[in-house]
Amino acid sequence: MPVNPKDRYDAMTDYLGRVGQFGPCMMRCSASTQVSIDYVDERDSIEKLRLGTVIGPILAYFFRNTPYFEGEKNPWPLLRQRMWDYLDFQRTNVLPGLFDPRYGWEDYAIDVLSTPLMFADLTHTPEAVASGATPKELHRPAFRENAGEVYPDRELNPYEINHIISTHFNDVRLKNFIELRHWDSLPIERAERLTEIVSSLFYVPEHRDRLESYFEGISEEEVFEAKANIQAHGREATPYGQPLHFWKEFLGLEGLLSDIPGDPKHPDVFQE
C-alpha cells in the first residue's frame, strides 16, 4: 500500500520500518479518530494530559473498530494501541514522567527536543534557507540527530516547534491544544458521539472534578498496567482494578451507537 509521496513519509517509512513490530503497518492501517481539547494555562494542560492518558484506553475499548487485521480476525482488543505502543518507545505511548507531581512544560520540551527527529524540516529556518541549501537538504532524514543538533541555537519559530512536536506520537500530545489520539477510525456518527463524551468529561466541571479526585495520585506504572490488562483480558479486563461495566457507568458511556457498521462497505461486519 503506497503512502503520500512526501519526503517526510519516505523518511518515516525507512525509519519506522526498521523498528518495532508494526512500523510499516502504522502508516498504512492505523487510521484514527482524534479529539482535540483546549487548555487555559500550564497547570490545566498537565491535568488534562494526565486525565486523557488515564481514561483513553478505556474509551478506546468501548469505541474499538478493528474486527479484522490483514485478512484475519484481529487478536488484540486494542490493535491501534498495540501497533503504536511497540513502535518506537521514545516517541510513542505514555509521556515519560507525566505523572510525576513536578512535571511541567519544560519536561515536555526536553523530551521532544532530545529525541532523534527522524525527519528534519528546515524549509522555514531562515539560516538554512539563506545558506543556499537544496530542497532535499531542507527536507531530509534525521535518524540520529535531535532538534538541538539540527536547528540553530536560538528561540525556535512556530513552524519549527510544530514540526518537532509532530515527530512524537504519544497517546496524548501537547500543542497549542491537547490532542487525544487513542481511538480507531470511526463512522462519523460514532466519532461525534465520542467527541460529545470527551467534551462532557473535560468541560463539565463536576465530571472533571470527579475523575481527577478518583485518579488522584495515580502512577505511570498503573497506566501501563491498565493498558496491558485490557489487551490481555478484553471484555473481562479490570483496568485500575474495576470491571468494564463499572467504567461504562462511571464515564457515562451511554448511547455508544455500536449498532452502526464500522465500514459502510461492509454493513454486516461489526466489532465483537
PLM regions and their residue ranges:
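Loop-rich catalytic cores of soluble enzymes, especially ATP-dependent carboxylate-amine ligases
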Residues: M1-R173
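Substrate-recognition/cap regions that form aromatic- and gly/pro-loop-enriched pockets
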Residues: D171-R173, I178-E254, S258
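Weak global preference for isoleucine
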Residues: I37, I46, I55-I58, I110, ...
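Eukaryote-biased recognition of C-terminal alpha-helical segments
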Residues: L251-E272
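Low-complexity, intrinsically disordered regions enriched in charged/polar residues
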Residues: K6, E155, Y159, H163, ...
